[in-house]
A protein has these predicted regions:
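Rhodanese-like catalytic fold shared by cysteine-dependent sulfurtransferases
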Residues: 1-19, 26-60, 66-101
Length: 101
């Protein structure tokens, strides 16, 4: 599900079953990330798919990338893999004005 920043962040902060998932490259992550995010690089092909398959399907995933494109694709892929609750950050880090590390 695509969510705008305010709704995405509010939902995440109030979700006790939430996991932040950053699907950007290492170079992008080095420029700043949302605190406590789990990182799996979208461009790692089979390794990325394997990493997704090994995630806990009972969790709620708040997924982001640089622009919202890769994270949107990741949410669709996760849904196909049996994840029920995935939330894409529309605009990604390009439009993020929340906390970073």
């Amino acid at each position: 599900m695509d969510l705008q920043q305010d709704q995405w962040w509010s939902n995440f902060k109030n979700d006790e079953n939430a996991v932040l998932l950053d699907v950007r490259t290492e170079d992008e992550v080095s420029e700043g990330a949302i605190p406590n995010a789990v990182h799996h690089d979208f461009y790692q092909g089979q390794d990325f798919l394997t990493a997704l398959e090994n995630l806990d399907k009972s969790k709620n995933y708040y997924v982001y990338c640089r622009s919202g494109n890769r994270s949107g694709q990741t949410c669709l892929l996760m849904n196909q893999l049996g994840f029920e609750n995935t939330y894409n950050l529309v605009g990604g880090m390009n439009e993020w004005n929340g906390p970073t590390v």
